[in-house]
């Protein structure tokens, strides 16, 4: 069986979820994922001027299309720039799936450069937030994220993606 990276698996999952448009801003922890998104031709990635705008653009996209808004930012300040937009989406019941880059697993909790506990910071303004700890869990977490964002009272979901998890190879 052919093995693919977590980055390729996420791109595949976006297509399976019917995500034809997303909003993304690349950075050190998400550059490989951004490269995978660039290589494919199904999901259009809109690059805003900065992260604060992109979560609001994803929110507006969700409100105007009835689809789940999707966005991608890097770690640290990229992730914290989502907070106001996530709060808005939460209070207005707008379905979003937001991906944040994160430092490698062995650096989490060690005050690494641009490491921030974004799941903890956004706990009260998201329906669900998780840091992906194992490559094997990625597919399940992605399916759950879209399901949770759109069911019941819609709202934002945050998936934190450690760089090493996304680089790992595994089954498709």
Model features per residue range: what roles?
Residues 1-172:
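N-terminal alpha/beta PP-like core and its mobile active-site loop of ThDP/TPP-dependent enzymes
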């Amino acid at each position: 069986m052919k093995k693919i990276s977590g980055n390729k698996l996420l791109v595949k999952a976006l297509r399976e979820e019917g995500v034809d448009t997303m909003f993304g801003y690349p950075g050190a922890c998400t550059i490989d994922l951004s490269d995978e998104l660039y290589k494919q031709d199904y999901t259009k990635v809109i690059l805003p001027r900065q992260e604060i705008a992109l979560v609001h653009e994803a929110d507006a996209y969700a409100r105007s299309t009835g689809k789940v808004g999707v966005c991608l930012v890097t770690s640290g300040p990229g992730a914290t720039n989502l907070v106001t937009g996530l709060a808005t989406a939460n209070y207005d019941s707008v379905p979003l799936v937001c991906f944040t880059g994160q430092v490698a697993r062995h650096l989490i909790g060690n005050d690494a450069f641009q490491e921030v506990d974004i799941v903890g910071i956004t706990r009260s303004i998201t329906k669900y937030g998780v840091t992906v700890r194992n490559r094997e869990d990625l597919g399940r977490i992605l399916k759950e994220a879209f399901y949770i964002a759109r069911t019941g009272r819609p709202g934002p979901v945050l998936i934190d993606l450690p760089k090493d998890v996304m680089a790992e190879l595994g089954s498709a």
